[in-house]
């Protein structure tokens, strides 16, 4: 082929002729044919058939050809006549195929192009085929939809031939108007870029069939007058309009497009960095050199000038030349070196190997370039041995790549802001792309960094050694990762792959980055820990079942929503013996208690440490280590917090514990606990629901509840402290839910809380000989309890019911307009029937029984020091704080004692209490909770009865 021919000049003012236009068209077609031949030769025999028959399957709607849907699907490519090679390829696919004359039917399709890297230096075996299929502008929506379904079917067919095919269906006039149908997907830039994509199309596309680009015929110096020139060519019939397709000019790239295009290249760069680095730097180059012509213009200028050599016009050669000229100077040498490495690795052609001879033109061209760069054979060998790259190599390279990608994004974002332009990318698309970038590159606490985004084929190691730092002396508590360390003594001289504060993080990092596989040999030097190879093997099995490798990218739908946890894996007691302190004493089990959170007679909590691994909807993997304080409760609190924002879909919780003897029991108990806690808080896929969840663990009680969307917990050191806390006032009704193992020695209390209801005052009692236990659950779920002597079953509830009746009567007087808001009283007896504790309803028949004696009332008052004191009325006799001061209680006790006719000691019961509305000095309480009245009643009664006993 002739590389240089005479230049062509078109002067639209002086006049043009059809013969010159045909020569110009044929010159572009000559370059086009060279690229098609190169693209064809790079494919395998089976893959070549896909490229050969692609125009034919859209030109004909033949049922024997791939992609056929139905007889109504649009078909026919303008001015297309299949070659003998194409017909033969079709017959190889379908023996019944025969070419029929369609007559003069108007074709539905204008043109078909292949664009991107095929036929270029950058094409590799992994490259895909991006096809533009352009339909006529008046095609109905139903026909367009049919073409899109046919394209999708062809994509699946091509996949069976080892070809990744993407066919984009659109109309040229819609393209010019910016009405693209597609959104951002894996292979579509959506709204992110228009002119940049058109610039790439004009300099890389291969015409497959149909109309030719009108852009070919417009001189590069006339790009600004594109529309006028195009109209002259058509109106004066220099060309037939149906022979050409018009995508419009690319005089320059609008500034507002740079941000969208930059974000898009970052999106692509997550999985294919080499190509994206080149494109991102080209975008930056365009943005910084706005006065210089675009590469598409340079390509067209070269063809007009007479250049037809495919090497010189290769899009990647031209791209590199532009970037090399722009990045001149020692201060940017590192960026230029990254560009060269990216181009070499994008080509995927290892020059140090003999088998590249089948890629003669690419090998020759690439060899010329690396020779010009002054690369040594050592550099080539390093790049050609990508499959032998280690984690350390990839980490360094990834850092360089991420720095370059983020540098480009920040620069473009800054430029877009400075020019005050709206980015040429929809808000939805930029949000979507930003989320993917965040998920891939953003560092945050606990996140497991993915170090190999398509940089090396594999980082798998044959042998990994995990060494506890105490093995090397000192009291350090971290872990070191080595490779091929057969002799532990060599650790002092071997490089460390990675250091970590805990073993689980090191294991998860190795697994997620592919260093650790089932075939990797493991070595453990545990030092002061008890980790073992068997524990690591079990951990690897748990990780493999929990998380796929490699971690796939998140789907568009997931990125369009807020991030949420999908599932959690809890690794319990990694490298820890939870019974070490018991074993030292020769103790293993001192009672029949099997609960792992209150094990044996010592009520030992066997959960010492937890490593929580979370896999979220953006496909980020993170690890949180809990080893100090109340580890299980802290972990539970964090899981609850992560669910609160999206309770409709509860994350899965898997638990693994290796510990010999009790490992499976510990894992089962922890898994039960998480399920039991999540269920009531988020029942029905909503929540968090208002409740208080009580867990008994390690001889203590933990009470979990939400404040809005924030979970919190209170640790209580004793049963008495728990009961005091449950009696405290609430802002709204909060029922008490007990964990399945909590307070098993208090079945009556569990039955009380199970029977509690909102907007009621419930009195529960249980008689035990001459003593009774009473509980009152008030209108907001606060629980108050006390013991009382039983002198008569009939009179047992009378004092408290009389007290509550007086309280309710006073509330009714205040709420005359809304009597329904005042809670009534219901009574229940706690009984055991058929081995089950339950609350049985008892009518309030005793409330009207008269009691001997007189009314004892207390009226609370606040003095200057804000201490709450009480004036007490015994019948008509008043005992005031002002008169009696600290001697008020003894005086009342003495008075009551003086009125009794016998020496028998029996308790005094208050019949009513008035509390001030400023009981809490910080707020004004319109309605004081029943539990608060019961508390002060109990305090006063206890004090009075103690003094009565003394005055005997």
Regions found by a protein language model. Give the residues of each.
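Well-ordered mid-protein domain cores that form the structural environment of catalytic cofactors
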Residues: 67-126
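Amphipathic alpha-helical scaffolding segments
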Residues: 129-135, 139, 146-152, 340, ...
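Nucleotidyltransferase catalytic cores
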Residues: 1-91, 178-182, 188, 195, ...
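Arginine/glycine-rich "motif VI" loop of SF2 helicases in the C-terminal RecA-like domain
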Residues: 156-162
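Short, conserved secondary-structure transition motifs
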Residues: 163-185
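Catalytic metal-binding acidic patch
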Residues: 113, 120-147, 164-169
